[in-house]
């Protein structure tokens, strides 16, 4: 019998879900859970999971996939804040948008996501990848301010545009931006233009402007911004 905490009380899970079980599972890796319905107020889905698969058909609330170490979560909708925070392994895919702190650390901690992969097919809120120390985040849409702040390792790839100050106070790692780059902090220095850069064995096709930073912290991180033909003044983006 499973119970759901609501405030200071606990209620049987059957009060909220109609549960159907099919087949047998020898362990967590054999479990596939499908959640249908209104999940807007359901928090911590897949938190600390180590294996198996969860499919959420709808929007989900805070902390989906937080601290997960294995398995896969697919969200066919949007996710609230803290998606995939401090995850160390596994795969989290969100069809819609995420709010702030995707793949980030919890308040007071300096180690965010350390492994695994997060794919956001929509837009990501502010401080995506904060304190990233491993793993990979791929945002197919746009990213809000301070993406990759305090990151020390790992890769953040953004297909869309990036708002102000990506990579602030980063010490290492890689941020790859395919869209248009907003304002950078002064701690980034221009290193030049690179063709088809390779990161961890993966080649990113095209010409990229490469910055190094954050030099205010003696950082050795790389920020790569794709050059667009329609943007002849791109080098002025740090002004």
Specify the residue positions occupied by each region the protein language model found:
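Acidic/polar low-complexity surface segments
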Residues: 89, 96-111, 188-196
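The right-handed parallel beta-helix/beta-solenoid scaffold, focusing on the short coil/turn
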Residues: 31-33, 45-47, 52, 58, ...
